[in-house]
Amino acid sequence: MEAKLKTFFAEFGLSIEKEKIQLFERYYRLLISENEKYNLTAVTGEDEVIVKHFLDSTAVLIYRDLTDLNAVDIGTGAGFPGIPLKIMVPGLKLLLLDSLKKRCLFLERVVRELNLTNVTVINERAENLGRQKPFRELFDVTFSRAVAEVRVLLEFHAPLLRLGGETILFKGPGVDEELKKAEKAAKQLGMELKDVYYYRLPGNFGERSLVVYKKLQNTPENYPRRPGIPEKRPL
């Protein structure tokens, strides 16, 4: 796996040191060994996991530096993009948020076995966490690879993001229609579309995009709405 990691990361324009390679190898072994128990991912082949999960998660680093930032990964699942970003940027302070207890148990094991510091795992819905004072408007940057519309994701992210912070959403190449639908939500939540970065994964694994919003105003106190409402009645 070491040679593949080096090759794929180099093709993506990122260098990777031996210690980080070893962490990715351990993460892969945990992901595969615990997959059946926790139902973590449908992607299990070595090349696919390296490119579609590990490498894709680190696409943010082509766009910006994350050193010493306070970040939350919303709907992290098996730890993407949060854990690959933490491996690549040890100085990142990270909260991994997921609503499923079994996934959080897996994440706690990964954090423990990889000896990752300044990483917290919380089993909670974003709609609830966004209403808790210790977390509201706390984070410098928020991420999500979760499968949901942009306008829905913005309601999860904006309440947790500090003024001037950035929300980075991982999307496919055809995101224009979603962005148009999200214009009203962004305005109501104090967010503004900053940029969309398109990129291609190596090994013919397809095109992706990073959608970046900046927070310009405080999010009104009535957001986020109750759990389930953002998906049922998007802004």
Curated annotation (Swiss-Prot):
GO molecular function: rRNA (guanine-N7-)-methyltransferase activity
Broadest EC class assigned to this enzyme: transferase
Residues that bind S-adenosyl-L-methionine: 75, 80, 126-127, 145
Pfam families, per the entry: GidB
EC annotation from Swiss-Prot or TrEMBL: 2.1.1.-
Gene3D superfamilies linked: Vaccinia Virus protein VP39
Record's keyword terms, sorted: Cytoplasm, Methyltransferase, rRNA processing, S-adenosyl-L-methionine, Transferase
Cellular compartments annotated: Cytoplasm
GO cellular component, one term: cytosol
PANTHER family membership: S-ADENOSYL-L-METHIONINE-DEPENDENT METHYLTRANSFERASES SUPERFAMILY PROTEIN
Function statement: Specifically methylates the N7 position of a guanine in 16S rRNA.
Similarity comment: family membership: Belongs to the methyltransferase superfamily. RNA methyltransferase RsmG family.
NCBIfam families noted in UniProt: rsmG_gidB
Name this polypeptide is given: Ribosomal RNA small subunit methyltransferase G
UniProt organism field: Carboxydothermus hydrogenoformans (strain ATCC BAA-161 / DSM 6008 / Z-2901)
